A protein has these predicted regions:
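Dinucleotide-binding Rossmann-like beta1-alpha1 core, especially the glycine-rich loop
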Residues: 1-71
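Mid-domain catalytic core of redox enzymes
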Residues: 178-316
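Short, well-ordered alpha-helix to beta-strand connector turns
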Residues: 166, 208-209, 342
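Eukaryotic N-terminal low-complexity, Ser/Thr- and Lys/Arg-rich leader segments
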Residues: 49-52, 63-77, 87, 91, ...
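Active-site/ligand-binding neighborhood in enzyme catalytic cores
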Residues: 59-192, 197-199
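Conserved flavin/dinucleotide-binding core of flavoenzymes
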Residues: 275-399
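General small-molecule cofactor/ligand-binding pocket signal
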Residues: 13-15, 170-172, 322, 346
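Hydrophobic/aromatic beta-strand patches that form the interior of the parallel beta-sheet core
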Residues: 172, 212, 247, 346-348
C-alpha cells in the first residue's frame, strides 16, 4: 500500500494522538494517559512486561511475512493460501490449525493478557473471539502494536486512482450474474460473462480470456454469481462471512455510561456479549482531524436499538446504520482457499481466509495478477510453438 500511495502521489492523512480505553461492560479496565510514559506504567502495572514481549514476537512474524514482497518482486506466484504462507515460513501454514489463545498460552503468556488485550484487538478488528486461527490473531495484534496510517481523502482513493488513471481499463458499472466456461475450437477456454448494467434488467454478454473475481465467494452473498460449464461449478466456500454493523451517530457522548469522567476518543470492548458494542470511536474527516468532532462510529455484531443509543449519547441529531459481511468467520477448521479456480479464472479474495486487511488484499491482488500473466504467456508461447511446428511440417509439402 505504501508503494501505491507513493506511485499515485497521494498523501498520508494527518492524525492526532487519540486516547483509548478498554471496557468490559462493568468498568474501564485500562485507560491511556495523555502522557505516554504514564500509559506504559499503567500497562506494566496491570500486565507486567508481557505486552512488550508479545510485540517483539509479533514483530518477528511480520519480518518473516515481509518476505512476500521480495518473492513477488521476483515473479513468484501461488495457487492457494497454503503455498503462499509456506513460501514465507514453513511454520506459517500450521498457524491456521491452532487458535490464537492456545498458541499464545503455549508461548507462556497469561490468561489475563489474552482475555483482555489479545481479545480486544480481535473484537475491534474482526468482531470475533480468541478461538480464531493464530495467523489472523497475529495480524490483529500487529494492528494494535504498530503505527497505522491512512490516506488523506480516504483509503478508497488508492483503488480509485489505480483504476481510473489506467487508460487501458474500461470500467463497466454492472452486476455480474453468471460465468459460463466455453471451449473455442475444442481446445481453448473462454469465459462468457453475463451481467446487467445498473438500473437495468437487460442481460448483457461478453467473452473474455481471463476472469478475475474480487468478491467473497459465499452462498449468501448480496449479488450471487452462478457458474456453468466447469468441471465443478461450486466455487463457493462452505464457511461464512462475519456480519458487522457500523452505526454512525452525530451526538454528544455520555462518558458516565462507560464509567468515565470525561470523553475519550476510543472505547474498545474486550467482552462484546456484555458491552453490546465492539468499539466506539470519534470519527474525523478523511482530510484530517477535526477538533471536537461529535460524530461517532460504533461497530457491533447486532443492530443497535434506539434505547441503547440514547443511553450512550445525548443530543442525538442523526443516526445511520450500515450492515455488511466484512470478513470471514475465522476458525481452526482448514479451508484451502484457492487463488486459481480454473484455467484462467482467478479469485483475489482467497487471501482473506488468511487475514482480512487492505495490505492483504493488495498482496492477494498482486499474486493473482502475476499468476494470470504467467498462465497467459505460457499458453500464448505454447500455441506459438505449436503453430511454428505445424508450419514447418507443411512447408516441404507446399514447396
Amino acid at each position: 500500500m505504501r508503494d501505491f500511495v507513493e506511485l499515485l502521489g497521494l498523501e498520508h492523512r494527518p492524525s492526532k494522538g487519540k486516547r483509548t480505553s478498554i471496557w468490559n461492560g462493568n468498568e474501564i479496565i485500562f485507560e491511556e494517559s495523555n502522557w505516554e510514559i504514564l500509559s506504559f506504567i499503567k500497562l506494566i502495572y496491570r500486565y507486567g512486561v508481557q505486552p512488550f514481549s508479545l510485540i517483539r514476537y509479533v514483530t518477528s512474524i511480520i519480518n518473516n511475512f515481509e518476505k512476500i514482497y521480495h518473492l513477488q518482486d521476483n515473479g513468484e506466484v501461488f495457487t492457494n493460501i497454503s503455498s503462499l504462507l509456506l513460501s514465507m515460513n514453513p511454520e506459517f501454514p500450521k498457524l491456521l490449525e491452532k487458535s490464537i489463545k492456545s498458541e499464545i498460552l503455549n508461548l507462556g503468556y497469561s490468561e489475563k493478557l489474552i482475555n483482555e488485550l489479545v481479545k480486544t484487538t480481535l473484537v475491534v478488528n474482526y468482531g470475533q473471539d480468541t478461538n480464531v486461527h493464530s495467523f489472523v490473531g497475529f495480524v490483529s495484534l500487529a494492528g494494535a502494536g504498530f503505527n497505522l496510517w491512512s490516506v488523506k481523502g480516504g483509503n478508497k482513493k488508492v483503488p480509485e486512482h489505480l483504476i481510473y488513471r489506467n487508460k487501458h481499463v474500461n470500467v463497466v458499472p454492472s452486476h455480474v450474474i453468471k460465468i459460463i466456461n466455453i471451449l473455442n475450437n475444442g481446445t481453448q477456454n473462454l469465459y462468457e460473462v453475463h451481467y446487467h448494467n445498473q438500473d437495468s434488467t437487460n442481460i448483457m454478454k461478453a467473452t473474455y480470456d481471463i476472469v478475475i473475481l474480487a468478491i467473497p465467494l459465499i452462498h449468501n452473498q448480496e449479488f450471487p454469481i452462478t457458474f456453468e460449464g466447469f468441471p465443478n461449478n461450486d466455487f463457493f466456500s462452505p464457511a461464512k462471512y462475519h456480519e458487522t454493523i457500523a452505526t454512525f451517530v452525530k451526538a454528544d457522548l455520555k462518558p458516565h455510561y462507560f464509567g468515565l469522567e470525561a470523553e475519550l476518543d476510543n472505547i474498545l470492548s474486550c467482552d462484546p456479549n456484555r458491552t453490546i458494542i465492539s468499539s466506539l470511536g470519534r470519527l474525523n474527516s478523511v482530510e484530517g482531524s477535526m477538533k471536537n468532532s461529535n460524530v461517532w462510529k460504533i461497530f457491533s455484531n447486532k443492530p443497535l436499538k434506539s434505547n441503547i443509543i440514547n443511553e450512550m449519547f445525548s443530543n442525538v441529531q442523526e443516526i445511520k446504520q450500515i450492515t455488511w459481511k466484512a470478513y470471514p468467520e475465522y476458525s481452526t477448521k482448514i479451508h484451502e482457499a484457492k487463488f486459481k479456480l480454473h484455467n484462467a479464472l482467478y479469485h483475489v479474495n482467497a487471501i482473506e481466509w488468511i487475514a482480512s486487511a487492505m495490505e492483504m488484499s493488495a498482496i492477494g491482488g498482486r499474486n493473482v495478477a502475476l499468476l494470470a500473466h504467467r498462465d497467459f504467456f505460457r499458453k500464448f508461447c505454447f500455441e506459438k510453438i505449436i503453430q511454428t511446428s505445424s508450419l514447418k511440417k507443411k512447408l516441404p509439402t507446399e514447396l
